């Protein structure tokens, strides 16, 4: 697989097609991308001027933004590739500098259900997390709620995992959870 974290957020359709053609030529079968990106993902519009959420509310998605996500998933599918789809980068789950996180257990469930329903028939592998470890019980609860929402929406028919930081595996937190299809061990972002 390849990582194109900012794919939905930065590129236009022509650039997306070029990128996917290039990855297909190189033999990639999975492209990982995040819907709510880490780098100004809530405040900077995509190439077509759309923000992902209405008033930063995860229970209200912006249709124009998600039409581009739909486009990417369809175009990848035409090339025999699945999308490793991260609903959000983990920075939106972590409280920082006294500021509340975007997600709480309730809106994480609703957001997950919206996405699970929307993409239940698509070639998607769900990847929660985003280069962060689960540090607090509240973070754990938020990820659990999002996973439950996705499974409610898609009927539990798609693979799902969690993307931790480097040299750590998702099994530390979620190995025995019914929604976890496989563990992810990130080999990058650490010194040898």
Positions of the model-derived regions?
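Active-site mouth of glycoside hydrolases
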Residues: 1-191
């Amino acid at each position: 697989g390849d990582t194109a974290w900012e794919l939905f957020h930065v590129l236009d359709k022509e650039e997306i097609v070029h990128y996917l053609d290039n990855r297909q030529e190189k033999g990639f079968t999975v492209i990982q991308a995040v819907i709510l990106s880490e780098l100004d993902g809530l405040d900077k519009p995509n190439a077509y001027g759309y923000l992902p959420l209405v008033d930063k509310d995860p229970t209200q998605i912006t249709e124009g933004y998600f039409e581009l996500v739909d486009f990417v998933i369809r175009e990848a599918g035409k090339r025999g590739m699945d999308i490793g789809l991260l609903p959000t980068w983990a920075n939106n789950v972590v409280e920082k500098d006294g500021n509340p996180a975007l997600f709480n257990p309730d809106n994480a469930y609703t957001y997950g259900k919206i996405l699970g329903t929307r993409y239940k028939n698509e070639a998607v592998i769900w990847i929660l997390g985003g280069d962060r470890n689960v540090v607090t019980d509240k973070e754990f609860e938020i990820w659990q709620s999002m996973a439950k929402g996705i499974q409610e929406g898609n009927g539990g028919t798609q693979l799902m995992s969690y993307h931790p930081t480097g040299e750590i595996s998702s099994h530390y937190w979620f190995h025995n959870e019914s929604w976890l299809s496989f563990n992810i061990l990130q080999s990058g972002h650490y010194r040898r």
